[in-house]
Amino acid sequence: MAFLNFNYQGGPKWYSMGNNPMHERTIDIARHFFDHNNLVGYEMWSNSTHNFIPEWHVDRDERLAVQEKRYSLPICNIVYYPLVENLKQGGEFYTDDIVITPKTNRLIIMSPGIFHGVKPYDNAIRSVVAINPWERRPS
């Protein structure tokens, strides 16, 4: 429940390591799969409404991509579902080659640079927290 009670304050926000131990536990798990030796912090945001469905995208430094046409990627991408209820159809997380059904307490860790999205859904509780650890703070 601690994830659900945290104030995510809208869109992506930057956090230095040590600020949110409960969220950083997901980064500790990701350390088993990705090198975090140069980790300086992470972006984090949450979504719990079916009114916003992320389209096909890759997590990246948005300013560099738009203004300088360069890709800078996080160390990895972490998606955590603290609560999913009454999801009867849709809401799946997908990439080119996999579809993952959201479930309460499910954690997804994936390599950077993988395009992904979410299938539309209605009338369900689908709380998701996205965490992107970085070797440098995105611009």
Would you name each region that the model predicts?
Residues M1-L107, G113, G117-S139:
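Fe(II)/2-oxoglutarate oxygenase catalytic core
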